[in-house]
Amino acid sequence: MTYEIDVEMEQKAADFYQSLGINQGPGDIQYRLILLVLNKNEGEVTEFADIREYTDRFADKGSIGSKMKTVFQLEGLVEKVKRGGYIITDKGIIAANFLKDTTDFYKKTKRMEDIIERMP
């Protein structure tokens, strides 16, 4: 599955969900980016370096590795297959598809806000 991850759009979507009080999952930019990178490499091993390529500007050193252990592995979203290598699980794919839906919802909401703003 090949697609580009729009980091700026994901940040805007995360900010939107945080404004609604949702700070985990859809409101967490690190979570969003990690899951989308893993999903992008579905069926292949995703290297830690692939994830860091997207998350470095949003994460402190060590926080991504910690999140991989405490959230992604613990919840069964990924399986660690080697040092620094992960494969997304079916549960992870479902979570990634949910995130894509949240991004689409954000875009539709933003578009509607823009239309309403222009109404006299």
Predicted regions and their residues:
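Long, compositionally biased intrinsically disordered regions
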Residues: M1, N41-E42, M119
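Intrinsically disordered, charged low-complexity linkers and terminal tails
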Residues: M1-E4, G21, K69-E75, I93-A96, ...
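Short alpha-helical segments that sit at the start of domains
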Residues: Y3-L36
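Short, locally clustered residues in the helix-turn-helix/winged-helix DNA-binding domain
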Residues: L35-G43, K100
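Short acidic, hydrophobic short linear motifs in intrinsically disordered regions
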Residues: G43-T55
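Short amphipathic alpha-helical interaction segments
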Residues: R57-L74, K80
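Minor-groove-contacting beta-hairpin "wing" of winged helix-turn-helix DNA-binding domains
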Residues: G84-D90
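Short, amphipathic alpha-helical interaction segments positioned at domain boundaries
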Residues: I93-P120
